[in-house]
Regions:
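ATP-binding glycine-rich loop module of kinase domains
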Residues: 49-70
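Catalytic-loop of the protein kinase fold
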Residues: 140-158
Length: 406
């Protein structure tokens, strides 16, 4: 049986009641790891249980070359909203940094490889495109770029959120502009590629500073991967990492968009052409392309924009129908859901209206996990959220939080 990180029986940690009052029935909280659900260069992710509720715990080895978890915590708290999993706790022990957050469903790569032809339909891909663009618009408006857009980093929600897409893994994310002046970082050559070469933009592969356009271009490659089940630069013989990046760059440059989009709806070709031609500082026209993919489904293919994907099961549909009826009863508004398409299309507007702006002390309040036994652990200057995000060097300045041993 595989050894897995766990909480010592004699130890645990306290947590702030403001994080999640429902879980704070006792002052002393312990999580029990159940199984590994993910792994990467950063470390491992486990499904965990506490008080009959399930969470995800990300473990980052303290001896790893890069420590990305602190960056991820600060950015996720700043971005918290409809598309970002909620953080429950952050701490460390002798060997690991640990992040506890909402348990999500499968990622899009996992869902893709389980399909019959290892492809998604036009409808499913368009539904995903609409949500991906919405998510990027949300984080870009908050001055953040992700820099590692790929199928593995988009996950579906569980239970009542099983039609919604979430973005994860913000360890490589950064500010692309000042939140005060909106001035973007200089367009300069970097030392190496940041992100995943298969989906990275041409500019990123050329090791240039990234901006909003690079996240969107990566979405374009992800969409073609969903529709075709592969990309022209997959499966090449590679000698080294440097050789791989060079070969992928050459292949991307040498493959025309027309060839890439052969036999696909024009909307996908138009999107990639647009993202490739964006200027470094140019603001993308997110809503135009969201509407294009919406219309592709509802007008050209005459289908409902209902968030029913290729992988959606009958059981999930029954749960959604039950929730839908409950919402009707709760709202007591016969006209509110008269047209399903209108309701779906306006989901984002409703969410945005209900969203709370991030307050300056949110990061401090949400992540002040204090002690083991009776000892305060490693209390090192928690910066207020506002101050963190006003600092253009967020990635270089490590954000230390009040942590606790698990």
């Amino acid at each position: 049986m595989e050894d897995r990180p766990n909480t010592p029986k004699s130890e645990g940690f306290y947590r702030n009641k403001k994080i999640d009052p429902l879980l704070h029935k006792k002052y002393f909280l312990k999580y029990r790891t159940i199984k590994k659900i993910g792994e990467g260069s950063f470390g491992k992710v486990y499904k965990a249980e506490y008080n009959n509720e399930y969470f995800a715990i990300k473990f980052e080895d303290k001896e790893s070359d890069q420590h990305l978890l602190e960056t991820e915590v600060s950015i996720m708290n700043y971005l918290k909203g409809p598309y970002i999993p909620q953080i429950k706790a952050f701490g460390y022990n002798q060997n690991y940094f640990m992040l506890v957050m909402d348990l999500m469903g499968k990622n899009l790569e996992q869902l893709l490889i389980k399909t019959k032809d290892k492809k998604f339909s036009i409808k499913t891909t368009s539904l995903l495109a609409y949500q991906m663009i919405s998510i990027l618009k949300y984080i870009h408006n908050k001055h953040i770029i992700h820099r590692d857009i790929k199928p593995d980093n988009f996950v579906v929600g569980l239970n009542h959120q099983n039609g919604q897409l979430f973005l994860i893994d913000f360890g490589l994310a950064k500010k692309y502009r000042s939140s005060k002046t909106l001035e973007q970082l200089p367009y300069i050559k970097k030392k190496k590629l940041t992100g995943t070469a298969r989906y990275a933009s041409i500019h990123a592969l050329e090791e240039m500073e990234q901006s909003r356009r690079d996240d969107l271009e990566a979405v374009g490659y992800v969409l073609f991967y969903f529709l075709n089940g592969n990309l022209p630069w997959m499966g090449m013989k590679i000698k080294s990492k440097e050789d791989r990046i060079k070969k992928i760059l050459d292949k991307k440059k040498g493959t025309s968009i027309k060839e890439l989009c052969k036999n696909l709806p024009y909307e996908f070709r138009e999107f990639l052409e647009y993202t490739r031609n964006l200027e470094y500082t140019e603001e993308p026209k997110y809503d135009i392309f969201k509407n294009n993919f919406y219309n592709l489904i509802t007008n050209k293919y005459q289908e409902k924009f209902d968030y029913i994907y290729d992988w959606t099961t009958e059981n999930e549909l029954k749960k959604r129908k039950k929730k839908y009826i409950n919402n009707l009863n709760d709202n007591n508004d016969e006209n509110h859901y008269e047209k399903e398409e209108e309701s779906i299309k306006n989901i984002e507007i409703k969410i945005n209206l209900n969203m709370k702006e991030v307050k300056g002390n949110d990061l401090t309040n949400s992540l002040s996990h204090i002690k083991v036994g009776s000892n305060i652990i490693n209390t090192i200057n928690i910066k207020e959220n506002k101050k963190i995000m006003d600092n253009d060097d967020i990635i270089n300045n490590k954000v230390y939080l009040k942590c606790c041993i698990m």
